[in-house]
Amino acid sequence: MKTNQSWGGRFAEGPKEAVAQYTDSQSYDRALYAQDIRASQAHARMLGRQGVITPEEAQLLVEGLDRVREEIRSDSFIWKPELEDVHMNIEARLTEIMGNVGKKLHTGRSRNDQVGLSFRLFVADRLETWRQRAAALCAILVQRATEHAGDILPGCTHLQPAQPVSLAHHLLAYAWMFRRDAMRLGDCLDRVRISPLGAAALAGTTYPLDPQSVAKDVGFDGIYGNSMDAVSDRDFVLEALFGGSTIMMHLSRLCEEIILWANPAFGFVRLPDSYSTGSSIMPQKKNPDVAELMRGKTGRVYGSLMGMLTIMKGLPLAYNRDMQEDKEGFLDADRTVEASLRLMAGMMEEIAFRTDRMREACKAGFLNATELADYLVGKGLPFREAHHVTGQCVAAAEKQAKGLEDLTLPEMQALEPRIGEDVYAILDYAAAVQRRETPGGTGPQSVAAQVAQLRTWLAGMDGMVQ
């Protein structure tokens, strides 16, 4: 059977059906249709300006591609698996519409640089959405923090009670994480927005192309420095997937805390019904399924990153068909990251914090022990000695099943005579939070400064996704 592939001139027969199915990518890379058309229109305009084709032909190609775009948007476009991918499907339909003029679109271009530009455009568009969603989640966390500036809860290390902190401070820790995530994606975009068009298959082209004008036309910052590098690397995908993996890691950590806090043993939050599910057998259950699934889906995004690293690790220069596998993993990661950020923003907006339970929990675990040690330092003890005396006080309180603040003054003075009546004000949990005003600390002025910093940054994030 004679092949009708674009590359079929030197072949006597086409690929077997099983081979065609195995190599087909149009079933998923059609997601790139808008970016492919955008890149092809920029290429056509450049060909017209450079005299490679006439300006009239360039305009016809642009108009024909507009028509193809509308057909795809309206679901009237007929996808043909035998044409392998989105790029050849679009070009074939353009040729059906425009005749021989359509066949001129690919002049001076290889699928290698064509695919590279289309995918870079797609990744850039998606990263911008991730960036805006991360910023939107950051904004919600900042807002919830301002609502709880005066509420305290146990801060933990090793998941053990450590020191009291404000709920605002705890929430802002995640706000800073998602701010960094958004900034990291912005840095990544600087390297994604590099156009490979003009590199052709690997060695450049003899046509008098103007790659810089194509880059400018599609909104990119510049062009490749080496044509072989331009078509043979996918480090921009790796970097994007790392950014997505880091977002998911931060989301997963927040999910873990939500899951713990929703457990009645903690009882720190009430989950919205709309972000919970029940049990088919236990009527009382209210399960944090959204948080659990988000924690689980983190592994999917990690898998996409590891898969892409593995695909690229042994490829010689320049382009190899292995690189077709770059898209499915990214497409899956894109759906997961975008949906997770959107759902977490909604959940954090509606979640109810049980601040009474948080405050009560501060009384367990001797969270004010560091306050006593610092108090003793103020009384003239070296810190290591103060640390030892405080440990003795903790042991004495623990033996009586009460808090440090419940020890009598004589009980404490028996361990260290310099302890005075003023120690009880020091041992107050809320006061302990208020005293920590170092930069980035949990004190109210420090928290207010953090809020101001984050809001200043958010104000520069134009067009945040809601």
UniProtKB/Swiss-Prot annotation:
Q: What class of enzyme is it?
A: lyase
Kindly list the places in or outside the cell where this protein is found, as annotated in its UniProt entry: Cytoplasm
Superkingdom as given in the UniProt entry: Bacteria
Q: What is its EC number?
A: 4.3.2.1
CDD domains linked to this entry:
Argininosuccinate_lyase (cd01359)
Keywords, alphabetical: Amino-acid biosynthesis, Arginine biosynthesis, Cytoplasm, Lyase
For this UniProt entry, what's an example GO CC term?
Answer: cytosol
One GO BP? L-arginine biosynthetic process
The UniProt entry, under PROSITE patterns, shows: FUMARATE_LYASES
Q: What GO molecular functions are on record for this protein?
A: argininosuccinate lyase activity
Residue span of the signal peptide, if any?
none
Which InterPro entries would you find in this protein's record? Answer: Arg_succ_lyase_C, Argininosuccinate_lyase, Fumarase/histidase_N, Fumarate_lyase_CS, Fumarate_lyase_fam, Fumarate_lyase_N, L-Aspartase-like
Give the disulfide map: none
- Which pathway features in its UniProt record? Amino-acid biosynthesis; L-arginine biosynthesis; L-arginine from L-ornithine and carbamoyl phosphate: step 3/3
Give me the reactions it catalyses: 2-(N(omega)-L-arginino)succinate = fumarate + L-arginine
A Pfam entry, by short name:
Lyase_1
Database matches in PANTHER family: ARGININOSUCCINATE LYASE (PTHR43814:SF1)
NCBIfam families reported for this sequence: argH
Q: Which family does it belong to?
A: Belongs to the lyase 1 family. Argininosuccinate lyase subfamily.
Name of this protein: Argininosuccinate lyase
Q: Which organism is it from?
A: Desulfovibrio desulfuricans (strain ATCC 27774 / DSM 6949 / MB)
Q: State the gene name recorded for this protein.
A: argH
